[in-house]
Amino acid sequence: MTQVVVGQNEAIESALRRFKRQVAKAGIYADIKKHQFFETPQEKRKRKAVARRRQRTRRR
């Protein structure tokens, strides 16, 4: 859970910016995007196979 404590003299905009930065760093946006639609087991296997292939080519 991401939390931002707003200081007494702190602007809401700066606190919002800090919150967005923490959410992006924690990977919450990517997780929400990944779980937005149902992924069939076949699609999941295909996505993981592509990721493995990509990793193999990066190592070389």
Curated annotation (Swiss-Prot):
GO cellular component term, pick one: ribonucleoprotein complex
GO molecular function: structural constituent of ribosome
Gene (UniProt): rpsU
Sequence ranges of Basic residues compositional bias: 44-60
A Pfam family hit: Ribosomal_S21
Biological processes annotated in GO: translation
Top-level taxon of the source organism: Bacteria
Protein name: Small ribosomal subunit protein bS21
Region (Disordered): 39-60
Coiled coil: none
Classification via InterPro entries: Ribosomal_bS21 (IPR001911), Ribosomal_bS21_CS (IPR018278), Ribosomal_bS21_sf (IPR038380)
Key words, A-Z: Ribonucleoprotein, Ribosomal protein
The keyword Cytoplasm is assigned to this record: no
Family recorded in the similarity comment: Belongs to the bacterial ribosomal protein bS21 family.
PROSITE patterns: RIBOSOMAL_S21
